[in-house]
């Protein structure tokens, strides 16, 4: 039986990108094109960037808590819209048969058997169709590992496989807003994605949360107020990628995590002391330790690629040792 969806379809494909990738058949850019931002959209994005205030401490010797790449996303102007006579899958309770949804200012305002819509609202008849909330995909490499994919330097930008610990990189600097996968995802009902670095490294760098909207810059897609994440990976991926230089074993992986967090603890204490007293010169900035220190402060959320139950337990032990929390395990095939 085929279901017809208006806003979103059910189903999320969450992928993993490690140091090696399998080649998959992909349409050529001529077959699938991301919608080019219109001149009005480009002007709006440029104006938003120009009007955005600089991060706290911008221009200072060091601004370890600033966001130098702040969101410039602005919602599109929209007309009040009501969808009637539709089966609503709320994801929070039973389905609503022959229900209605009111959208105002680009957001869901009312859901139920009936809604109070403005007289001038656009009315869409959803008879015979299903309606769901937009899907939030918390594990994506879209934009960073763009399609059509390759094994070279053109579109594969999610693994900075030059060191087992690359907390200094931010995946948003690899996101290509014209990736043809973006409109495909939106057509499938995915409205928000967390783009993660790949799983080649013990610590792969910062993630970013994006709205799936046309934009010429990644800042124009960034979800306002969403926290950064930190991608970590355990098990076979890092030890396979770094087998010739280390870590080449799981015990080497664990030693690598602990060494990184020990450095981050020291860095955090140095900066906390200077922020309290402002005496003397501030500590030298280190982008990688800066990210890890923000994890220890609770400002950046850890997302951990891990397969085996015993390794998940080990990662939880490490989190307890250094006082941070793991927000989610990804690919946790033994999480049950």
Predicted regions and their residues:
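Histidine-rich, glycine-flanked metal-binding segment
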Residues: 73-77, 88, 92-132
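Post-signal peptide N-terminal segment of mature Sec-exported envelope proteins
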Residues: 21-67
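Bacterial signal peptide processing site
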Residues: 17-19
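C-terminal motif of bacterial Sec signal peptides marking the signal peptidase cleavage site
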Residues: 13-15
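Polyanionic/metal-chelating signatures
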Residues: 181, 186-326, 330
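Sec-dependent signal peptide recognition
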Residues: 2-9
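Active-site-adjacent beta->alpha loops and helix N-cap segments on the catalytic face
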Residues: 334-336
